[in-house]
Amino acid sequence: MLDCYVVKEVSNDKLKWEYEFVIDKKYFLDQLDSKLSEIAKNVKVPGFRVGKASIDLVKKEYLNDVMTDVVRKTIESTSSDFVKSNKFGEIISSNIDIVSYPNYYSDNDSKEENLVYKLSFEVMPEAPLMDIDSIVLNGIEVDIQESDVSEFIENLKKQRPNFIVVNGAEYAVQEGDKVVIDYQNKVKGKILRGGSAKDFALVIGKGVALKEFENQLLGMRVGETKSFPLTFPDDYSVAYLAGKTTDMSVVVKSIYVVKDVQDNESVARSYGFKDVAEMENFVRKQIGQQFDQMVLTIMKKELFDYMDNTYSIDVPECVVKQEITKINKEILDSGEDIQIDVEKEAVRRVKLGMLLIRMSRHNNITIKNEDVLSFIKNNYTDYGVDINNVLKMLQSNKNFANYISGKVLEDKVINYIIKLVKKDRKVMTTKEINLMFENI
């Protein structure tokens, strides 16, 4: 530890500390004079050759700048020396408040004539290591019943409805029907670019076209022609149409209605399966994968509750504040009326994060490139996001990269723990698991 300063503890509040430093005046002035002498050897002062100006002239010109630089370096060296010597651990926030500056021209060695500053900081404590052997979670196994398979197949039918053509001119278009039309869209009698089509098919209510356009088709019959004004919204994706009113003309050429397919054999063939048995095996596998993810989420919640209730940790105030800001943004972005104790949730998240980090360090759990790519695939590209855009974000946005790394490491540690803990085997139906999942 350096002997050029004296330290006094001002406050100590769990993880937050404050100290007052008084720097030895002779030490400081020696540093200042050394720097001024170094400058004097190389500086060019008007009227003098390089290095020939008197030290008094150099002081007059450079004292303030040199003083600022020496103060900065002295604070850095003494505070760093003190923190390292006392092994405070990981400092996550700090602040310097200069109380007084030394008077270069005074011989007074009182405290007020010295460099005095206060250093306040907050440390990240080491969380306790969790005892994995004491953790018991519910090892839920899903019981897939015939009714689950039947319900899944019914949803397959709805996703690929069986349309049959309507014969005759009496039937009027309804919501859910498929219509085949010819249309022309004009402004001042001129057809717009891309504003006409023949044999254009759309299902009413699917949102393929503007709602106002679809509403005009409701009630029309085969062979009927209709003209009407159509106003495009101000934020319409095609810029030259945004906010404009056009003249639309439509002819209904054919109408198709949904006819439920009763036999599963037809459904199986429509999806490319060779028979019903192959389709049902596929369905069981899909249901199993879906509920495996739900069970994993339920087990994570159980694990987090156990960690939160079992371990008491002092959490850093500055990290909690950052988490509060993050949670408030999540609530705002969701657009939902979420009623939670934000500060309590922030403290919980920080505590859980500290416990997981300790576990990762103790067991040398690290993340690899393939872990990151797998996470991106499961959470972004499987939902239509271009993987190249995500990778560019990783390289250009440090906050996003830190977020992804944190989530990947968290998942890896959680999966490591869940794999090792004791489990009480429990067989549950899909309805029971759904209920548990909804109550998380």
Swiss-Prot record:
Keywords: Cell cycle, Cell division, Chaperone, Cytoplasm, Isomerase, Rotamase
Protein location: Cytoplasm
Database matches in Pfam families: FKBP_C, Trigger_C, Trigger_N
GO cellular component, one term: cytoplasm
Reactions mediated catalytically: [protein]-peptidylproline (omega=180) = [protein]-peptidylproline (omega=0)
Ranges in a coiled coil: none
EC number: 5.2.1.8
UniProt-recorded Gene Ontology molecular function terms: peptidyl-prolyl cis-trans isomerase activity
Broad class of enzyme this protein falls into: isomerase
Keyword Lipid biosynthesis tagged: no
The keyword Cell division appears for this protein: yes
HAMAP family the UniProt entry points to: Trigger_factor_Tig
Function recorded in the entry: Involved in protein export. Acts as a chaperone by maintaining the newly synthesized protein in an open conformation. Functions as a peptidyl-prolyl cis-trans isomerase.
Domain remark from Swiss-Prot or TrEMBL: Consists of 3 domains; the N-terminus binds the ribosome, the middle domain has PPIase activity, while the C-terminus has intrinsic chaperone activity on its own.
Protein name listed in UniProt: Trigger factor
Gene: tig
